[in-house]
Amino acid sequence: MRHLISSLLLTISLLASAASVSDTALLAFPEALGYGAYATGGRGGVVYYVTRLDDALNSDGTPAEGTLRWALTTGDDTPRTVLFQVCGTIYLRSKLKLQHPNITIAGQTAPGGGICIAGANIYICKPNVIIRHIRFRAGDIPTSNYPALDVENARNIIIDHCSFTWSMEECLTLYDTDSTTVQWCIIGEGLYNSKHKKGSRAYATQWGGEHGTMCYCLISNCLNRTPRFNGVRDEADLANGKHNHDAQVDNVFYNNVIFNWGKKNSLYGGENDSTKNHAADGSQLGYNRVYMLHNYFRAGPATLAANLSERYFVQGSKAGDYGQWYLEGNMFEPNNKFNPQKKAWHADTLAKVNADNLYGYASGYAYRAFNLDGALANADNYTKYVLDSAQWAAINIRDSILSGEEAYRMVTTSAGATLPRMDEQDTRMLAEAAGTIDPLFVGKTAPSNLGIIDSQDDILFTREDYFYINDSTVMGGYPFLDALEGDSLALDTDGDGMPDLYETEMGLNALDPVDGAMPSEQGYTHLENYLNGVANGSIDKTRYETEPYTSQQPDAPTELESIRQTNHNAMSNTRYDLQGRPLQNPLPKQIYIENGQSKMQQ
């Protein structure tokens, strides 16, 4: 699997370099795409190593050295690169708000299985940030409704190969931003009937910002907001020279896979609240334009259970006015066993809207795949709210865009935090979306909605991480990321972020703490060349990991381990129908689930 992923990443690198527009600026990394592709992060700055998994504080309330909180908040605005000498789950006891700009967080450098951030969230509110290969799994242990990651009031952000799951709010929140990219991520399995004060959720992402790109992401196992396009908000007053919130919005959403949603309008939003965005002559200053291209929609058991008589690629919302939309090449998977038995889902109907995403809007066709909430489907509104191909071409996107089918194959093998190795959670979610297994896990609230969970405790793993949530309490229930037998740690004597053996191999000085920040012939710093090589598979970092690694995870409490084992034994070899109900005697030819596998009774 690792060699397959590496090969795919090298292919993606070639796609990224075959841009339609020649760029002189250096990309964040060679595979960077979209509006956030030119973030510089910690380039040329200092290195901070995370050396412990806890979220401890000193007696004066400052973060303990070696913690993630310390690495992200201490010091000044000098660019920094955060690397990891630990592996496992880091439970944040409170929100971690960035205090400085110009940060790279390189999860691919961790030993063992890598890094997961649980509990409270990281709040990105500073510019110029690169995040790669980190899992953000908030969970329901905290009492607050945290999104797994919150990005607001920031610009020049790129998030690559990360995973966002198990949030009581959206799994990823990103708006009031400019020049951002979310690429090759897994977003989903939001918690449904959890502890949120507003009740049931199961939301994937509220996403937008001015000049935002989302591409090659899997959005899965959520009833709604897959995504919710944030749109233009009411607060901006461009006529008075203010620009504090999203007001002139271009969002590009392409080559994503949406699986197992539960609402006809699970993609919606994109409002243009223009009530304050007018010049003195009354002309509109603010706008919202969403470009949706070649995304792949695959129904799942929650879609089937909803029995939807309508289904949309997107439904635009109104707040003052509707935004404008460009749709091209999006497709619903035909002949899927989870497609509801409704006219809107018949193969001939899907063929029409797959061939022309705007089919029937001007004529009011009942089974159209684009809709505006509350607006008539007619020729006038088509002309007003639909962008044409010339307007799409005018924004001059440099990215190479694949067909929906090609994107589906690549996303379902390569999205998420794949390094240092893929965990059990991401492996399952990719397999579900790819159709090699059917969703099995379900919460107690809606047992017919397979794949929709109430708590991370609804998921069973063959092996788990354990971590402290306070000074004395140990919890588990998260996928195993600790080191396996044979996993080691790289020695970095000078602390410049590069292993000693690598520096020697490259003709650098393993005792010079400055050479990592120096630019190479390629333009990237020597440290960036190492990080980029590890990420795209051209560098095997295990060749340089020669030092023994000692686990920092606490032992599992005896009573907790006993409960987990009892639940696992109860689940094993039990058969379930497609509504998640235990099944004693399947009927002939009946499809059922056993140990996460779809089977048919003979």
Cite the ranges covered by each PLM segment.
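Acidic Gly/Asp/Thr-rich repetitive segments characteristic of extracellular carbohydrate-active
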Residues: 27-81, 577-584
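Extracellular calcium-associated, cysteine-rich motifs in secreted modular proteins
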Residues: 475-556
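Residue-level detector of functionally pivotal "anchor" positions at catalytic/ligand-binding pockets or at interdomain
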Residues: 552-579
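Extracellular beta-strand-rich solenoid/capping regions of secreted or surface-exposed proteins
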Residues: 64-76, 90-104, 114-132, 138-155, ...
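C-terminal tail/sorting-segment detector
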Residues: 591-602
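Extracellular beta-strand/beta-solenoid scaffold signature
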Residues: 117-122, 142-150, 166-174, 195-209, ...
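Right-handed parallel beta-helix
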Residues: 102, 106-107, 127-138, 153-166, ...
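Extracellular beta-rich repeat passengers
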Residues: 228, 252-473
